Amino acid sequence: MIGGEEHCVFFSLGVIDELQSRFGKTVGQLLVMLKDPVEGPGYLREILTALLNDEGIRLKNGKRYTKEEVGSLVMQKEIPGLTISLFLAFNDAMPEPEDERNDEESELLDIAQLLIIATSKMGYSEEEIFNMTPKKFFTLFEKYLELNGKKKDTRAAIDMLP
């Protein structure tokens, strides 16, 4: 919510190019600058101006904002919330890391293998498996991972936390 209006902004290629060309920094570096109590508000105003003008282009409503107009729309108490929203919007615009995609694909294969093993070796019928509660299915899946040596020991990860 900016200036009492709901907006749908995101970091399009146009916004990213405009900001990086203007400041000679990546958008990620610009977002980090938002934490600076002196320079942060100026960067926030510039980023919001680019995002709102991009929204006007996408929606073809002809709305164009100057940085002065954007600055007058944002109250001091809204700055922390807007900053968080910008970080989240930028995070949503980033591609998913390759290794996370591979983990998800691997988990899907593990679940498919579990279904085959549960029916062929453990004696469950397909109907029984599909009628299992999520908790029972998850327990069966956890046991499958343990037996196949794929389950990660979460206790070690917890012990390493500060």
Task: Report residues per predicted region.
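Charged interaction scaffolds used for protein-protein
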Residues: 1-8, 13-50, 54-162
